[in-house]
Amino acid sequence: MLQIKQDLLDALGQALKTMAPDSGVAAVFESPKVAAHGDFASTAAMQLAKPLKLNPRQVAENLRGLLLQAPAFARWVDAIEIAGPGFLNIRLKPEAKQQVVREVLQGADQYGMQLADSPHRMVVEFVSANPTGPLHVGHGRQAALGDAICNLFDTQGWDVWREFYYNDAGVQIQTLATSTQARAKGLKPGDAGWPEPAYNGDYIADIANDFLAKKTVKSDDREFTASGDVEDIDAIRQFAVAYLRHEQDLDLRAFSVRFDNYYLESSLYSSGRVDSAVQKLKDAGKTYEQDGALWLKSTDYGDDKDRVMKKGDGSYTYFVPDVAYHLAKWERGFSKAINIQGMDHHGTIARVRAGLQAASAGIPQGYPDYVLHTMVRVVRHGEEVKISKRAGSYVTLRDLIEWTSADAVRFFLLSRKPDTEYVFDIDLALAKNNENPVYYVQYAHARICSILGTWAAQGGDASQLKSVDLSALDGPQAQALMLLLAKYPDMLSNAAAGLAPHDVAFYLRELAACYHSYYDAERILVDDEAIKLARLALVAATAQVLHNGLKVLGVSAPHKM
């Protein structure tokens, strides 16, 4: 059906050129807000009315006449109706919609994907938690968002690089070290001599005990053996960071999130990248000194005020390593960069982009892109859950996975726009009913697999479904299901362009609902062989698209439930 839609759009474009060669009106189809109005809709007639100085409905009549003469419309379109002030509502013939079943079954896991001969390179930075404690549910939302956005761009033919940026050079790391040292010396929160500020969770005691036991910890890219010397604060710091990096690796593994690279903030200093970035800005004439500090002329690039880069004591402000880091992204060949961060990072966007523009490195405006998300509240039995014994002051990602499942956490956290607050209801995530969105979608897939399994047990061969006669798929529920399957590729493309994985979750819920309606309307395993095979082909195609969409979200598509 993809080619059919393109042929119809080409015919519409040619008709628009015939009527108004210089109008600039694009050939675009929209989805009617009411399904009964048709399968595609066009507002082109209303857009042409002004340049043609004609009534929109008259333009629609003229445009309709041209379209009816086009071979593609004659072959695939059942009717073109004019509605309201000049809408063109297009109804497809059943055989046009039936084409999508073959496209899905032939494309299989590749259905909806765009292939590129020479894909552009992009980097998506997400999670990027300080190695100072277990990952909390906010990090979980970021992990789900980042991984799904990477998966979306994978489907669009991009060469996607997944990166975790470790903030291992800030004051929080020193707080981690002093907290661990205090635990190693036998102190507890509230004792005389307990440091302030400090991390108070039970995990600090675990780190201290392993440090005293001289254990070795290994994260994905390095390992460190404890010395056991409670006076060696640097050794304690290195061990604590390695320990928590390992713990975070375990959290992410439980969430099925992988990274291609772990980039250390400290490496920006040790490699000289921070000093180099500052020198670039100086050489470009985009800095000045005032009150003993070095300032960036960030107002030249849309920031609301100039920003201090280097304080009087010689230390850099926190956005300077961010500028250096993003210069490094560009220099590594990433033409597109996306950062998934909490809403509290909103204030850094303008100054980081200003620094990149001021560096005169050829970086386009708006680099990098940002997806900002709000935090997550967790409720159980109607009461908010705030405390985790392990973390001390927040619910961890691992808590949530253990209480529910990785699938539920993923789907739930992706089922709302990132900038809307989300309340994670543990009871709902555990429910086995239609109110639970992930259960509802997964059950649709499992239900189809059960039908196909029953047929296979009777001697059915799934490979023959790619070529069966589909003319029996002419009922309204079947037509609606096929039209929705046909929307999957455009939905994926639009979701990637809009950095909107929630659109995939919305689509899957709609597809599951459409399938359940079809299942209730028509028996699949009927006696008539031709009808049975056609219906089996349709439900097999539906299962394939459910599987593909769930894979984008990082959620499993079970065969049994």
From Swiss-Prot:
CDD domains: Anticodon_Ia_Arg, ArgRS_core. It comes from the Bacteria. It catalyses: tRNA(Arg) + L-arginine + ATP = L-arginyl-tRNA(Arg) + AMP + diphosphate. Its main location: cytoplasm. This is Arginine--tRNA ligase. It comes from Polaromonas sp. (strain JS666 / ATCC BAA-500). It is found in: Cytoplasm. HAMAP family: Arg_tRNA_synth (MF_00123). Pfam families: Arg_tRNA_synt_N (PF03485), DALR_1 (PF05746), tRNA-synt_1d (PF00750). A motif ('HIGH' region) lies at residues 129-139. One of its GO terms (cellular component) is cytoplasm. Keywords: Aminoacyl-tRNA synthetase, ATP-binding, Cytoplasm, Ligase, Nucleotide-binding, Protein biosynthesis. Monomer. Coiled coil: none annotated. GO terms for molecular function: arginine-tRNA ligase activity; ATP binding. Belongs to the class-I aminoacyl-tRNA synthetase family. The lineage of its organism: Bacteria, Pseudomonadati, Pseudomonadota, Betaproteobacteria, Burkholderiales. NCBIfam families: argS. Its EC number is 6.1.1.19. GO terms for biological process: arginyl-tRNA aminoacylation.
